[in-house]
């Protein structure tokens, strides 16, 4: 598994995300692909060509002072009450509200449970395999925004992600 701070956990023999284990796995992959006559980069391009060029990013908004926590909660409440129908070039298809354990299809109004533990997280499923997610930090006076898209090339995915991130910031 991976985490935002780029930790890597392979297997169940260690509980800490460890750079040594990650480097060992990377070296093992490089050695394997060398026997296949390709580099790690070649294989990465093979994966992109097969599955698409996915790209993700994040940004944060800081809310300092005594009223910071209230402003963050107000922002989360506003997203829940006034779910955007469109974010930039992308139509919002579904909203996953983990705090209220509900997935809402915005076209039909149908709902289903998330089936996951409750958490103050909103995940917006967008058309064309794009998405964004918003949540307050558990340790800092910040709201974190995550986004991801699928493009047809490295350049296309970078351009689409930049446009989506800008649309989220201006929403």
What are these regions (language model features)?
Residues 1-135, 142-146, 153-158, 165-171:
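Phosphate-binding and adjacent anionic-ligand microenvironments
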């Amino acid at each position: 598994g991976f985490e935002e701070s780029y930790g890597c956990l392979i297997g169940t023999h260690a509980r800490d995300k460890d750079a040594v284990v990650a480097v060992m796995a990377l070296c093992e992959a490089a050695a394997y692909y060398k026997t296949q006559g390709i580099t790690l980069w070649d294989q990465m391009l093979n994966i992109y060509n097969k599955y698409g060029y996915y790209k993700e990013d994040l940004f944060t908004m800081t809310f300092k002072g005594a009223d910071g926590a209230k402003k963050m909660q107000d922002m989360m409440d506003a997203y829940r009450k006034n779910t955007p129908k469109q974010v930039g070039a992308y139509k919002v298809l579904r909203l996953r509200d983990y705090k209220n354990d509900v997935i809402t299809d915005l076209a039909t109004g149908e709902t289903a449970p998330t089936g996951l533990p409750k958490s103050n997280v909103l995940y917006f499923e967008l058309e064309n395999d794009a998405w964004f997610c918003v949540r307050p930090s558990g340790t800092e006076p910040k709201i974190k925004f995550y986004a991801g898209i699928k493009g047809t090339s490295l350049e296309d995915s970078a351009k689409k992600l930049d446009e989506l991130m800008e649309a989220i910031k201006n929403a």
